[in-house]
């Protein structure tokens, strides 16, 4: 399902700020596997997730998802198959948009409420209700007004609106 072969990433190579973040890492996960990446601050956990998601190209190696080489695939194309929660609860949502608009965006509606049907809005409300934190009553509120925990819960819902092939949770509390 996910196969990482000999990837390496060095930031600022050849400078005094050179930092080897990942060196010759290989990993293989099969469908249904659950894995935890554990390490101290600065160990490269987020860098690994960033490489998988296409935030940057690795210096060496390859990344495959469902036997398809995604090493050079653009970030937006990878996002169709990868759901992600970031360490920072401020990432993963659009703070100036409403809860409903964020959910519409995650559902592939482009965030345009005029194209969101009544049935889709009801689906959003039902999914929010499952979180049991009252967000279903605040669908017209901007996401930027939510607490960090509420945003993390919303981001998890958004990341799984269309079930991803791979879900990355970049924080122990995520």
Where are these regions (language model features)?
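The feature captures the beta-strand-to-loop junction immediately N-terminal to the Walker
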Residues: 38-40
């Amino acid at each position: 399902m996910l196969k990482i072969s000999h990837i390496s990433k060095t930031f600022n190579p050849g400078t005094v700020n050179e930092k080897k973040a990942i060196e010759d890492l290989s990993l293989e996960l099969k469908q249904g596997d659950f894995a935890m990446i554990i390490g101290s601050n600065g160990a490269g956990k987020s860098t690994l997730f960033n490489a998988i998601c296409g935030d940057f190209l690795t210096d060496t190696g390859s990344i495959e998802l469902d036997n398809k080489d995604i090493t050079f695939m653009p970030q937006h194309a990878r996002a169709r198959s990868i759901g992600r929660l970031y360490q920072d609860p401020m990432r993963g949502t659009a703070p100036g948009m409403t809860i409903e608009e964020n959910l519409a965006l995650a559902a592939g509606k482009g965030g345009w409420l005029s194209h969101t049907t009544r049935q889709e809005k009801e689906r959003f409300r039902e999914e929010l209700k499952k979180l049991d934190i009252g967000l279903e009553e605040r669908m017209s509120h901007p996401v930027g007004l939510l607490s960090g925990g509420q945003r993390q819960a919303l981001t998890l819902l958004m990341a799984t609106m269309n079930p991803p092939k791979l879900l990355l949770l970049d924080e122990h509390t995520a």
